[in-house]
Amino acid sequence: MDRYPALNLPPSRLRAAHRHGEERVWDGLRGCWLLLTPEEWVRRHVIGWLSDCIGIPAVNIIQEYQFSLGGTRQRADIVVTGRGQQAVMLVECKAADVAIDQCVLDQAVRYNSVVRARYIMLTNGLRHYFFAAGDGTT
């Protein structure tokens, strides 16, 4: 894990292992090992921040939230839910070396047209952007 950059998020205690010649990280929410990629590094830290610092219960943090958009399957990185499992925040994570630009925002807004979360968070672990969706869609 030394090859991944320090992020602008609180440190997370990650459980890592080399399996099948690849670096893997334990996903405590889903109970499985995941390939550790630069984007997954950011996602693990965001999840740690949401649960450990903000206090969001694990049951309200949905990873790789699947939905259909225009007839194709899509996945939002993280969706935080509230009462009745209604989406409160859609989180789009990128690797630390990926700029958070208009294309990333457009992607999140497209996703949110289906997810209908009240808030959108875009992050590459270094920079974080938060948006309030006026009517839950844009």
Predicted feature locations:
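A short, conserved, highly charged catalytic patch centered on acidic carboxylates
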Residues: M1-Y119, L126-T138
